[in-house]
Amino acid sequence: IAENIREVYRYYKQQGWNYQQYIACMDPLYEEHGLNPYSLTSDMYGKFLSELFECWYKDYRRGKQPYIRQFENYIGILLGLPPESCEQQGRCGIQYVVEADGSAYPCDFYMLDEYCLGNFNEHTIDYMDEQRKKIHFQEVSMRFSKECKSCPYIQLCRNGCQRNRVEQADGTYKNYFCDAYRF
């Protein structure tokens, strides 16, 4: 999709799909970013975002743009509104992703045994909230690198999704797609 976003955008519009959300392709958790044949590089993602924005903005000027969550959040941020997307809040929100068996996780990108907060058939929400605190899920998402804190783009980027961050030597995190947001 990243290499053909103009065609994808046109196709989605032809289908009447006016609500769109694009999530960057992620490498497996705990693996170094960019080593798989399908890996999305920061450069590719930056070009993707630029081309998608050009398509969207052209339609916006005609009053016929689809709702694209990321762009709508950017506009809201520029207008002083809080973004609803956790990726653009700069920290993980409090939410529960629940499997059919009742198992609950803090995020759909962290549905692994080590992140299981409990099970709705066996535990209370208070118990699951305590588990979330024990694994420091939200606290870790708020560790920005010094470079990020002083970056002129931090108000828009906010270091992105925790899942796309790379740990720095000082224990803070920097978004793998940082350069893409500066495109």
Whereabouts are the PLM-identified features?
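Radical SAM enzyme [4Fe-4S]-AdoMet core and its adjacent flexible, acidic
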Residues: 1-91, 97-100, 111-117
